[in-house]
């Protein structure tokens, strides 16, 4: 049923009668013409109540200058322009919006002032605070300098506060001198999807870097998706790999050719090298090739197929060894049955192109249960179970049949998985010898290497690596809490290093409803290139829990991982890789070892400037040597070129706030684990103060200019991201956070790819009841679902009749206001009465109305990792939260509103005030 054009008759207490949305009842500041445009669509609309302002000041109004069209879903009265919540107008059309806040028209210094004023008058603002533009856009010269870098735009954080939409802008552009690359390819420099630098203009000296107080680090995410098909890059199959004789860098788009193209000069160390004879020969067509078309000279991201000399041993098969907890806890919560069924249903998805993939299974309670699975077509197709009770020195009964080839034993593996649950369905065994099982598994697969996948619902309580219940509620929130975040048993670190040396990687899937010591167990993935996946209070009896795990585990099994991998970063002479952060084992000063290379993690590398850089451009090259799932040795090379500068203003104007926040997220986790939570939080606050003070002293002329807080526009979100990090589950001060939840959060803070990490620190909130007409529908050009504009995470942005989606990438909350109108509840949930609305984990019903379909499309699109350019297996739970409903759930959802005051933490206004005082 379509609503009448003017919306429904106003409910008691919502809005006044009158011409709903007519130009006479305008919201101040929205031009009458804009009001008419809203109805010009001619489509009939639903309207879910609202004060009688036709357009406007709803959460979605001030962004990009588009008023929500039509009788929007409930709009709320104009926001008071309180300090700290004024909405800057980004690149808005001046005809549509009042020009109350013209961009960044605050005079900076006499030279810049005039230009900034002109930008403001033209409705333009900082070029990289505009909607995303192509990365390599030409930059027009602004001053007589060799190559003008990014312009510094000062803003006042108190009067022009951060807007969440800025987190969707690209980083400051990398401005290279013309002719830097050997061929003018648009793909010559590494896109930010794969590598981001905290500084897109690099100081030439250590002293300038030190003076800036900014970190110089790379955020490296070598893969943009779990599957090759979704992350197509140039592969060079001819095995002609030209490398510098001295520094071992790979040839790349930034080298220079000399001697009529017979030699090339390395852009890292300046050595002249010979071009290999086969470099200009097309081996497939057996004829000379055009060098200017070679992918390694045109693309910053390439993958070489490696010849024999890049192998320590022949490529090994892909091996998955499943260590499954079959104790009482794991049988009763349904983990055993669900994981067996999920492995069986995913057998076709496990990478097996070369038909060499091998699987093995060990069941674990107080004993170890090995399974010998015969080949398909054997006389006896039944799997045999062999039980070993000696946990100190677990031996391998018959190593031959314990790891079986998937292609040869497919049917019998299915038979075994069908029977596995029955074997243990009546167990009363509470023991869990997972440490001993890991040792046994290591013995089994260490000759070939591979993955050990642990599925457990219990604390390992006997055998090797036994742990005790050490969580103490009285310690939570005190300085002693930090000890609970450290490893309780040295076995987990020393064994992890052994695994790394034998090319064995460990992944943990943990499901306990009791304390499970994630802090200790997560060391195994941390040092072996694995990951810890945590499902607190999981129970297969809840369909949402079972489906979430099944979808994630199936994605995990299907992901194409690299094996026997090493990562190294090389750079221009004068730069040195200093510290590496992430899940791997640091084998030597500059080599990171990964028994398996995952596709859903990022790494941070800190760069030191050891000697003065004399070149106008520096290059940093990441290389990942690995074996693909189908047994091919390859090298993925990512080359990033950055301009250098001797000017502090350039360094600040080209700093990438999201890469900086990622670097400090890793630093904060390291600090929390070594010194404690309080020192980690204090270090973040001290850093925010230090950066603001440095900027004020060095670049804002030391003035306090009327009590403001000056910072460049491109870094305006940094103080907010620091506050959000301090308030994150992993770091925030609270006596209510179970240690396992905190440890799992710290794992995420130190492994998530940058786009997901930003969302985990500063979640996305979308206002759904008044979303623009195109939101939740496919974009005409791209076909992608359009999301509503995001809203800042403050309760001031939430109205009592609203419907909001809050999503941190791990969990989604659908917030239903206490005054939501019946029509909204009917359209979204299919319920006539608010009292029938059940809260908690659920999926929205699929109803036959366009608003329900659009809301579901927005929820699904918000979960879409591919559009963010990252790989991830996570499918967040959706929790429905009523504003006046279950208090625990409501408080949990409210912890996402990081700009509010909560528990023992300050609001954004208080935080900015305290920074202002300290600066």
Curated annotation (Swiss-Prot):
Disulfide bonds: none
Localization: Cytoplasm; Cytoplasmic vesicle, COPII-coated vesicle membrane; Endoplasmic reticulum membrane; Golgi apparatus membrane
Membrane topology note: Peripheral membrane protein
Chain sites annotated for binding Zn(2+): 244, 247, 266, 269
Main localisation: cytoplasm
Compositionally skewed regions (Low complexity) per UniProt: 1-38
Source domain of life: Eukaryota
Protein name: Protein transport protein sec24
Originating organism: Aspergillus clavatus (strain ATCC 1007 / CBS 513.65 / DSM 816 / NCTC 3887 / NRRL 1 / QM 1276 / 107)
Biological classification of the source: Eukaryota, Fungi, Dikarya, Ascomycota, Pezizomycotina
């Amino acid at each position: 049923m379509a609503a009448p054009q003017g919306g429904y008759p106003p409910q008691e207490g919502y809005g006044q009668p009158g011409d709903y949305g007519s130009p006479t009842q305008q919201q101040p500041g929205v031009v009458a013409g804009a009001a008419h445009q809203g109805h010009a669509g001619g489509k009939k609309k639903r309207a879910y109540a609202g004060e009688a302002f036709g357009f406007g000041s709803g959460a979605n109004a001030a962004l990009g200058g588009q008023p929500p069209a039509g009788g929007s879903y409930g709009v709320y009265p104009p926001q008071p322009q309180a300090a700290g919540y004024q909405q800057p107008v980004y690149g808005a059309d001046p005809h549509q919006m009042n020009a109350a806040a013209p961009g960044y028209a605050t005079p900076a210094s006499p030279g810049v002032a005039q230009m900034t004023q002109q930008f403001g008058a033209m409705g333009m603002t900082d070029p990289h605070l505009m909607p995303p533009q192509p990365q390599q856009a030409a930059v027009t010269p602004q001053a007589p300098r060799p190559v003008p870098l990014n312009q510094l735009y000062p803003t006042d954080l108190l009067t022009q506060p951060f807007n969440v939409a800025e987190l969707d802008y690209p980083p400051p552009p990398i401005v290279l001198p013309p002719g830097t690359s050997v061929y003018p390819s648009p793909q010559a420099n590494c896109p930010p999807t794969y590598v981001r630098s905290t500084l897109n203009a690099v100081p030439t000296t250590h002293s300038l870097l030190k003076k800036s107080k900014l970190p110089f680090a790379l955020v490296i995410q070598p893969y943009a998706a779990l599957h090759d098909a979704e992350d197509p890059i140039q592969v060079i199959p001819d095995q002609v790999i030209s490398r510098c004789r001295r520094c071992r860098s790979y040839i790349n788009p930034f080298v220079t050719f000399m001697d009529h193209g017979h030699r090339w000069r390395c852009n890292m160390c300046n050595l002249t090298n010979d071009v290999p004879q086969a470099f200009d020969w097309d081996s497939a067509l057996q004829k000379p090739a055009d060098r200017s078309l070679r992918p390694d000279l045109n693309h910053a991201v390439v993958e070489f197929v490696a010849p024999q000399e890049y192998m320590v041993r022949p490529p090994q098969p892909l091996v998955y060894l499943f260590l499954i907890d079959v104790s009482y806890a794991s049988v009763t919560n349904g983990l055993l049955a669900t994981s067996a069924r999920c492995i069986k249903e995913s057998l076709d998805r496990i990478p097996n192109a070369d038909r060499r993939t091998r699987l093995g299974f060990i069941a674990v309670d107080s004993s170890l249960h090995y399974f010998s699975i015969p080949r398909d077509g054997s006389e006896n197709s039944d799997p045999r179970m062999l039980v070993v009770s000696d946990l100190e020195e677990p031996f391998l009964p018959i190593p031959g049949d314990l790891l079986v080839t998937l292609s040869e034993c497919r049917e019998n593996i299915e038979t075994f998985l069908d029977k596995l649950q029955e074997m243990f369905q009546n167990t009363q065994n509470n023991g869990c010898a997972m440490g001993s099982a890991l040792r046994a598994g290591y013995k089994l697969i260490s000759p070939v290497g591979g993955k050990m996948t642990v599925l457990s619902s219990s604390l390992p309580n006997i055998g090797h690596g036994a742990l005790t219940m050490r969580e103490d509620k009285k310690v939570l929130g005190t300085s002693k809490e930090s000890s609970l975040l450290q490893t309780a048993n040295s076995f987990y670190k020393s064994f992890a290093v052994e695994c790394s040396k034998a090319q064995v990687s460990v992944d943990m899937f943990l499901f306990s409803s009791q304390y499970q010591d994630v802090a200790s167990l997560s060391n195994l993935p941390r040092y072996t290139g694995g990951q810890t996946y945590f499902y607190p209070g999981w129970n297969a009896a809840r369909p949402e829990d079972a489906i979430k795990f099944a979808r994630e585990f199936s994605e995990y099994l299907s992901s194409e991982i690299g094996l026997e991998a090493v990562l190294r970063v090389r750079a221009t002479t004068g730069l040195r890789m200093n510290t590496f952060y992430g899940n791997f084992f640091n084998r030597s000063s500059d080599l990171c070892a990964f028994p398996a290379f995952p596709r859903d993690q990022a790494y941070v590398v800190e760069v030191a400037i050891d000697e003065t850089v004399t070149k106008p451009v520096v290059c940093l090259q990441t290389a990942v040597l690995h074996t693909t799932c189908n047994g091919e040795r390859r090298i993925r090379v990512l080359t990033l070129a950055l301009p250098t500068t001797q000017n502090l203003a350039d360094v600040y104007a080209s700093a990438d706030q999201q890469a900086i926040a990622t670097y400090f997220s890793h630093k904060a986790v390291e600090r929390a684990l070594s010194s404690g939570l309080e020192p980690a939080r204090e270090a973040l606050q001290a850093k925010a103060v230090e950066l603001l003070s440095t900027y004020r002293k060095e670049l804002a002329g030391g003035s306090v200019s009327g009590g403001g807080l000056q910072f460049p526009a491109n870094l305006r979100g940094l103080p907010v991201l620091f506050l959000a990090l301090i308030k994150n589950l992993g770091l925030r001060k609270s006596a209510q956070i179970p240690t396992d939840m905190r440890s799992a959060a710290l794992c995420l803070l130190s492994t998530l790819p940058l786009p997901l990490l930003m969302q985990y620190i500063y979640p996305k909130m979308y206002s759904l009841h008044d979303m623009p007409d195109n939101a939740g529908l496919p974009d005409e050009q791209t076909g992608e679902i359009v999301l509503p504009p995001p809203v800042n995470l403050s309760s001031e942005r939430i109205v009592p009749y609203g419907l909001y989606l809050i999503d941190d990438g791990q969990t989604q909350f659908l917030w239903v206001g206490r005054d939501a109108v019946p029509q909204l509840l009917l359209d979204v949930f299919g319920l006539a009465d608010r009292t029938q609305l059940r809260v908690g984990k659920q999926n929205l019903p699929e109803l036959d109305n366009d608003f329900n379909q659009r809301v579901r499309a927005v929820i699904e699109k918000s979960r879409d990792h591919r559009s963010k350019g990252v790989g991830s297996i996570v499918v967040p739970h959706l929790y429905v939260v009523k504003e006046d409903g279950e208090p625990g759930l409501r408080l949990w959802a409210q912890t996402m509103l990081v700009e509010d005051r909560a528990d023992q933490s300050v609001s954004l206004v208080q935080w900015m005030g305290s920074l202002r005082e300290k600066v």
